Design a protein with these regions (language model features):
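Non-catalytic accessory segments flanking enzyme active sites
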Residues: 18-21, 159-162, 167-168, 172-180, ...
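Multi-bladed beta-propeller domains
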Residues: 1-17, 50-65, 87-89, 96-112, ...
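Predominantly five- to eight-bladed beta-propeller fold
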Residues: 45, 130-182, 227-232, 280-283, ...
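Cap/lid segment of the alpha/beta-hydrolase catalytic domain
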Residues: 389-508, 515, 549
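Active-site-proximal cap/loop segments of hydrolase catalytic domains
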Residues: 467-656
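Residue position within the beta-strands of beta-propeller blades
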Residues: 29-33, 75-79, 125-128, 213-217, ...
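Short, solvent-exposed loop/turn segments at conserved positions within beta-propeller repeat blades
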Residues: 39-44, 84-90, 135, 172-177, ...
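Blade-terminus and WD-like Trp-Asp/Gly-His loop motifs, strongest in beta-propeller folds
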Residues: 21-28, 66-74, 116-122, 204-212, ...
Length: 656
């Protein structure tokens, strides 16, 4: 069969799976399935049910994502099916029986609610929004709600900033809102506040008997909440409503998360040895005495940091079964499933690719994974594929298989990959695109990446690697104070190795692109070498000094990654800023930036573009309204198409 190339809009054919969850007894599993809709320029998400080996849709509204099982036969999910035109704060949850019937309204809350946790007798634990100055909106007082909406309308043209960070990527100005924990009395249809005003709740977990709740608390009433310093762990007896501190974060013991075991609690905490990117070790906490003791030294990444542009949504990365912890961890270039038992870590399911989320119940396992260069599917605990939801998306298409290309640079190995162009003929010359990942604490792995496959289908070699600073290799990720040095050397040496290994690569038609950290490196590269025919810098960093003051992670991330404080070490910031070297640039460069990117704000793109334009360098800046740092992964479908067409068109236009 003659294969067709991957099309620029083929990401719209891919279905993204997330939030895999077993029913209480494990007889069924529910998950979300999302898909980009090009004509509607949006994403639609629905709940699907896997039972007895068959998959069927459970909801049809197109906006369902958050859900939980109420019991073995009933799923509760968030949706807004009332379609009210008037502004409202309320949120609604519906329940649907798995054996048929229409969804029916189950709960209406007077505030935005993000999570619900069923309790015995029909009551709920709820995490919902608290708004400063209107802390009692949860009571359902209609006059108070009206006053809040009127105040919001009155002040919609103004932003008053009193905290750091003052905005979040993917959102807007913080405005001081935070999550609180509430108890919902189903008979009275009333919420009761459980956690204090000015204290943000996260990572809520119920004990198996549902009598005690654990949660992380962070004081957000202060001008600079410690978002990057770990939170404190608390618990509350739901009968007495007595709250007590369980464990506190310190500079050398930053609590990232935790898991509730049968006889002890597991803490995941980092000692800060490698700054804010330090990986966690495991600690054991006694339920009675609250004594904390070391359980297992790990120092590897938790969760999947394997990059791809065909995911939409998340899911569980760790779960306790008795006193055994099952967790996803990124090692080298892949994310596998491991277990921690009796203080020792052992592999459970490790294959090339990425396990993105999982669930385990009654010895059953379901994994959502990117394996075998396929889009996401569900697999059982033996690795057997149990769904075929994405077969049609790639059927009859050329999918380049990544060929491993490793080499030794100084005292370490650099791991990389090569995708051959469609129709590759030995001895024929082909243009090359070098793609650099973000992070920098992420990895490229052997998984399906739409943009790379699109370029391979258009006749390009695509090469990519994991330089110093990448995840999956412990301390290898520590690049503090070294940006633009050893990483730059690794990247350039990888290009040399690729050209030597594949004589079909056309060194005169060599292109480069990257986003976020990859955008930083693009900006750095064009100021330090002219080897690339043209480059495309995406959502980049160009100036650490200005980044400090405008990014949602600016003060913390910039000082951590530069390995210095802006005061008195401003020269160190400038030394590692691509803007310092912008007068050396000769390479034609395209800049892609989103106007609502608050992680690497648009001023970073403005600065590099202005510098190049002022020095007469061919350059182009393309800005996207209504998009943020996630443009390439979850931006509006038409915007994603425009972005990829801009980059590809830039390279095509500069080919000799």
């Amino acid at each position: 069969m003659r294969l067709k190339p991957i099309a620029v809009d083929d990401f719209c054919a891919v279905r993204s799976l997330a939030n895999v969850t077993f029913s209480p007894a494990g007889a069924s599993a529910c998950f979300t399935m999302s898909q980009a809709k090009k004509e509607k320029n949006c994403y639609e998400s629905r709940l699907y049910l896997l039972k007895d080996g068959a998959v069927r849709p459970l909801t049809g509204g197109g906006k369902e994502a958050s859900f939980c099982y109420l019991d073995e036969n009933t799923v509760l999910f968030a949706a807004d099916r009332e379609g009210g035109k008037e502004p409202s704060l309320s949120s609604r949850f519906y329940k649907i029986a798995l054996d048929g019937g229409e969804a029916e309204l189950a709960y209406t809350f007077p505030i935005p609610v993000s999570q619900v946790f069923p309790l015995p007798g029909g009551d709920l634990l709820v995490t919902g929004s608290t708004f400063p100055g209107f802390e009692n909106l949860y009571t359902g007082d209609k006059k108070l709600a009206k006053a809040y909406l009127a105040d919001k309308k009155e002040n919609e043209d103004y932003e008053v900033v009193t905290q750091l960070p003052w905005w979040w990527n993917g959102g807007t100005y913080t405005r001081g809102a935070y999550e609180s924990l509430f108890y919902y009395d189903a008979k009275k249809k009333a919420l009761t506040r459980l956690t204090g005003v000015g204290l943000a709740v996260s990572d809520v977990q119920l004990t198996e008997d549902r009598k005690t709740v654990y949660y992380s608390l962070l004081d957000v009433s202060v001008p600079r909440p410690a978002y990057f310093g770990g939170a404190d762990l608390y618990r509350m007896d739901l009968t007495s409503r007595r709250e007590e501190a369980v464990a506190k974060s310190r500079t050398d013991f930053e609590i990232a998360t935790y898991a509730l075991g049968r006889s002890f609690l597991l803490l995941l905490a980092a000692d800060g040895k490698y700054g804010m990117n330090t990986d966690c070790d495991f600690y054991k906490l006694d339920y009675e005495t609250l004594a904390v003791s070391p359980y297992a030294v790990y120092g590897e990444s938790i969760g999947s940091s394997v990059g791809s542009d065909i995911r939409h949504g998340g899911g569980r990365a760790m779960k306790m079964d008795g006193d055994v912890l099952y967790f996803i961890s990124t090692r080298f270039d892949s994310a596998g499933l491991y277990k921690l038992e009796n203080g020792a870590v052992a592999p459970v399911m490790v294959r090339d690719g990425s396990i993105d989320c999982f669930d385990r119940r009654s010895s059953k396992m379901l994994l959502c994974a990117l394996w075998d260069m396929r889009a996401q599917e569900l697999y059982d605990g033996t690795g057997r594929r149990v769904t075929h939801l994405n077969d049609a998306a790639l059927r009859g298409k050329y999918v380049a298989r990544p060929e491993v290309l490793n080499f030794t640079a100084l005292d370490h190995e650099v791991h990389g990959f090569v995708l051959k162009p469609m129709g590759f003929t030995p001895g024929k010359k082909y243009p090359v695109i070098f793609d650099i990942h973000g992070g920098p604490k992420t990895v490229y792995g052997p998984v399906f990446y739409h943009e790379m496959q699109y370029w391979a289908g258009r006749g390009y070699f695509v090469i990519f690697c994991n330089p110093t600073g990448s995840d999956g290799r412990g301390a290898f990720m520590d690049i503090r104070g070294k940006y633009g040095t050893v990483d730059f050397d690794d990247l350039m040496a990888f290009c040399d190795a690729a050209l030597a290994a594949y004589p079909e690569m056309d060194r005169d038609n060599f292109f480069e692109t990257g986003g976020s950290y990859g955008g930083f490196m693009t900006n750095w590269i064009i100021g330090h070498t002219d080897r690339f025919r043209a480059c495309a810098s995406q959502r980049s960093i160009s100036n650490w000094t200005s980044f400090y003051g405008v990014s949602d992670i600016g003060p913390d991330f910039s000082e951590d990654q530069c390995g210095a404080s802006l005061w008195p070490d401003a020269e160190k910031f400038w030394q590692h800023s691509p803007m310092k070297y912008a007068d050396k640039v000769k390479t034609p460069t395209l800049f892609i930036h989103s106007l609502e990117d608050y992680r690497c704000p648009v001023d970073q793109g403005y600065q590099m573009y202005s510098a190049l334009a002022a020095h007469g360098v061919e350059s182009r800046l393309v800005l996207f309204r209504g998009e943020n740092h996630e443009l390439s992964r979850s931006g509006k479908p038409k915007h994603r198409l425009r972005r990829l067409n801009e980059i590809t068109g830039w390279f095509d236009a500069h080919r000799r």
